Amino acid sequence: RIKASIGQSYYFSDRRVTLNQQPDEFDTQNRTGPIVNISSQLNQNFTIAANSAWMSNGDNAQRDFQAYYVGNKGNLYNVGYFYRNNIPDRQSSYDQAVASFIQPVKDNWRIMGHAQYDLDNSLMREYLLGVNYESCCWAVSVYGRSYYNDLDDPNAPDVHRKRAVMAELTLKGLGAFNNKLASLLENRVLGFNKINQSWTQR
């Protein structure tokens, strides 16, 4: 099955809230470019998705493609490509590839990983690796992460890679003491919510 959507905004007047004191060409345009979203679940396990956005002059502003496989035993494998064009004073360019996985290893244990490679600068922008244990009553996750912030220029002499160790404890029925890790995985791993719900409810 295939799902597709397209959208475009039209304005009746110039924007009153701007990034700078003086409106630029984007603040006075009467419409945006189109945005297109397409996804297809090829079978019970395999899904692909693509998104693209254009500016009103027809230039492509950004696009991405992702594919993920969800297994029947709680495993997930994900690859994707993301491109964003440089728009002065609006957005910086990037050209990146991502991959992630969730793999059960034994009983209630599973390992998870995510990597984000910067094609422009030929370096690993982010990688994350961790382990998760989940029982009927509680769950714990511990992860190590090495990354640059989205706005960091890794070639700048004063910019250094950041490193962190994160932990999350969840008591079933009470929620998590720290939900930042779950939010991070939701944003990084396509299909995480789907596979995580089936894992916790098994």
Regions found by a protein language model. Name each.
Residues 1-202:
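Long, low-hydrophobicity, solvent-exposed regions enriched in small/turn-prone and acidic residues
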